[in-house]
């Protein structure tokens, strides 16, 4: 059976993926404990930045304790900064390989992130390359 928190999490992810200003009625009923669980789910699925992007400006989020809001925002921003840095490093490495005449085929990571409306909000831990 899917919980209220999981239902809210899925609604938030759907709102992120569709870039629609969703009517997130599921958030209104969440307790602080459920909000914490929602953020844990988001972190487990590497979607904390995406979830924060959707909920960060909602009245429901504004009602959470300052420390929780600050913690979620900090973790989301750190994730984004780390991803931007990893992406820049990857692009530099890819360019160097191409200058050496090596044409790598990017298998996932940056390619999969490009499917998201805001790719830097979906971190990837590594980039898989096929080098012929």
Task: State each model region's role.
Residues 61, 116-117:
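Short Asp/Glu-rich motifs
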Residues 111-113:
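Short, solvent-exposed loop/turn segments at secondary-structure junctions
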Residues 117-132:
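Catalytic metal-binding acidic patch
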Residues 2-7, 18-108:
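Helical scaffold of the NTase/Pol beta-like nucleotidyltransferase catalytic core
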